[in-house]
């Protein structure tokens, strides 16, 4: 049945790609360009960043193991999670990351045990929307991002044992399940060095379906008698019975400032569904990429140009947040304090001063003004 479902999904995806018409520059972009890389040989050293231009949080289907700088490689055939990432390059690696993963059948947390086979034929990757079929779990995962939040939608099979894993990774983390609110909160301190001692990325997930199974995870041990865990490597599982084709929606946000700010950042999603969020993201991308119009009879040239332009406007990363009063605030990577004003990060000055910042100054001057005033190297 799973193979039949994958075949049907592939046919529909192929039909959609064939029928697709170019209506904006974002349609030329492939986030998968440059992902067929490995440590020994780079063909780009990129990952498919599902994000908005200069967004605070990116999302990536995670094929690499926890801590692997090559988070997604095109030649991989298994996804082990959908990771919120802030990684500027595999060499700098990541910080503040955590992962979400749907599973069915057995309640598992281990990243190898929960991993699922996938095919690029059943994968749709755009800057503003991602979709993939996880064959081992018979689950379709969809993601649509905003600057600091994202909407997930999981389409489950008929199963008495459908779960969602939240993995806050190692180096010190905390996760708490709140069944009365269909909510999971927590923080991750995962980083690759160079952060203040009080560094945390606080996250919140809100589901639209009540939990019938809950468990906290500490050091790989799943404990159904606990709702929270503080550990070097903490996580959680929640579960429910699902009907065939039942969709479970999850709204996710995070903050480097506080748990309360993470809740505020969740409001970026408003009451929009995933299609509406994706449509708004598409418009943002078309507006940004549309600053440059290229005319060429060779569609491969257009795909190459706009895929590279997409990469050029991902960074510097916005590292600021909007508080309850509407004021711009940021967590300082210099001293660990919460301060007023903008902050941008994740740019390598040794390279970007040559081309990127002059380019931003020409094409996106208002953005570049703030960047030049408030930019930090990667934490």
PLM features per residue range, with description:
Residues 1-21:
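Bacterial Sec-dependent N-terminal signal peptides
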Residues 20-376:
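Accessory carbohydrate-recognition regions in carbohydrate-active enzymes
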């Amino acid at each position: 049945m799973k193979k039949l479902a994958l075949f049907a999904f592939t046919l529909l995806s192929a039909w959609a790609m064939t029928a697709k018409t170019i209506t904006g520059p974002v349609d030329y972009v492939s986030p998968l360009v440059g992902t067929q890389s490995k440590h020994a040989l780079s063909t780009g050293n990129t990952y498919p960043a599902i994000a908005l231009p200069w967004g605070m949080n990116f999302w990536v289907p995670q094929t690499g193991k926890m801590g692997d700088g090559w988070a997604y490689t095109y030649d991989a055939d298994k996804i082990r999670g959908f990771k919120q990432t802030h990684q500027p390059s595999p060499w700098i690696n990541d910080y503040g990351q955590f992962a979400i993963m749907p599973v069915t059948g057995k309640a598992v947390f281990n990243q190898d045990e929960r991993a699922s086979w996938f095919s690029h034929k059943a994968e749709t990757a755009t800057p503003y929307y991602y979709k993939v079929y996880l064959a081992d779990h018979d689950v379709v995962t969809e993601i649509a991002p905003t600057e600091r939040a994202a909407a997930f939608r999981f389409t489950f099979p008929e199963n008495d044992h459908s779960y969602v894993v939240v993995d806050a990774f190692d180096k010190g983390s905390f996760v708490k399940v709140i069944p009365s609110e269909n909510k999971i909160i927590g923080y991750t301190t995962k980083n690759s060095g160079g952060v203040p001692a009080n560094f945390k990325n606080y996250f919140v997930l809100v589901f639209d379906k009540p939990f019938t199974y809950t468990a906290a995870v500490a050091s790989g041990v799943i404990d159904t008698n606990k709702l929270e865990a503080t550990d070097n490597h903490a996580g959680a599982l929640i579960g429910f019975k699902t009907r065939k084709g039942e969709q479970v929606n999850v709204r996710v946000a995070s903050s480097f400032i506080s748990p309360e700010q993470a809740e505020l950042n969740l409001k970026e999603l408003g009451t929009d569904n995933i299609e509406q969020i994706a449509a708004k993201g598409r418009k943002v991308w078309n507006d940004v990429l549309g600053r440059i119009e290229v005319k060429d009879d060779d569609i491969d040239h257009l795909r190459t140009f706009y895929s590279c332009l997409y990469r050029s406007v991902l960074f510097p990363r916005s590292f600021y947040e909007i508080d309850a009063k509407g004021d711009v605030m940021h967590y300082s990577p210099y001293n660990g304090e919460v301060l007023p004003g903008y902050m941008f990060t994740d740019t390598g000055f040794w390279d970007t001063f040559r081309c990127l910042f002059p380019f931003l100054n020409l094409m996106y001057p208002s953005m570049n003004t703030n960047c030049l005033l408030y930019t930090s190297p990667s934490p």
